[in-house]
């Protein structure tokens, strides 16, 4: 049974963005829904395609009053390079650690030391509205499905 489920508050966190600024989750919730996109890393081609697909529909997420935040165990340099290469306009947070992975009940690949993908859509008060945790690079909710979810809640 997952630790986090709809109605539970997500753990707060502080991570440094690729530009070196501290990002505090709860200070940035505001009045919008927030979609946390946990991805494997810049090295994962499927993650790159997925993040690019999210970027292509960013205006629709904003129209659905939803901000996107992508998180990984990447280094700040790798995260910055990926953000620039893909032209991502949403927040990218590198430096995800094992404590956060455990707090969010994500699948962790012990052999290669990275988290598997997950999506958490949270309300402005920090409670979970929807989540999907995968155990491999495949099986993530499609962008169209995510837009349908954020538009209907």
Locations of the language-model features?
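Chalcogenol-based redox active-site neighborhoods
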Residues: 1-153
